[in-house]
Design a protein with these regions (language model features):
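Short hydrophobic/aromatic patches at helix-to-coil boundaries
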Residues: 109-113
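Short functional micro-motifs and their immediate structural scaffolds
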Residues: 81, 97-98
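Short cysteine-rich clusters marking metal-coordination/redox-active sites
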Residues: 73-76, 89-92
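Solvent-exposed beta-strand sheet faces enriched in polar/charged residues
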Residues: 29-32, 63-65, 108
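Cys/His-enriched microdomains
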Residues: 71, 87, 105
């Protein structure tokens, strides 16, 4: 259910950006999502279909690009991109990791008319 408020924010950001460019219509909203963002693109699309009615984003399509999980090992200092299902340092095997990224949910770009 949290996708409703997230979608409202995505819509607000997109409408402001489109208006600033003088665009009349938003065709595509491209998102960047970290593996721990908790955002389900299909849910965002469903809410956008409802929230976007009567706006420049009516009929817009969501495209999401998944970002990698980046960590730094607290033991050996190595930085790496890892799979969220295998959380350990690829260099030394330590489980003591500091997350550098992975919670992102950003509007990367718009395709507009």
């Amino acid at each position: 259910m949290h996708e409703l408020s997230i979608t409202q924010n995505i819509l607000d950001i997109s409408l402001r950006a489109a208006a600033a460019q003088g665009a009349k219509r938003i065709r595509v909203i491209r998102l960047e999502l970290g593996p721990f963002s908790g955002v389900v693109p299909e849910c965002v699309q469903m809410y956008l279909d409802v929230l976007g009615k009567g706006t420049a984003a009516e009929g817009a399509r969501i495209e999401a690009r998944r970002l990698p999980l980046k960590v730094e090992c607290r033991d050996c200092g190595a930085s790496a991109e890892i799979d969220r299902r295998h959380i350990q340092c690829p260099a030394c095997g330590s489980l003591r990791l500091k997350r550098l990224s992975g919670r992102e949910c950003t509007v990367e770009s718009l395709e507009v008319d």
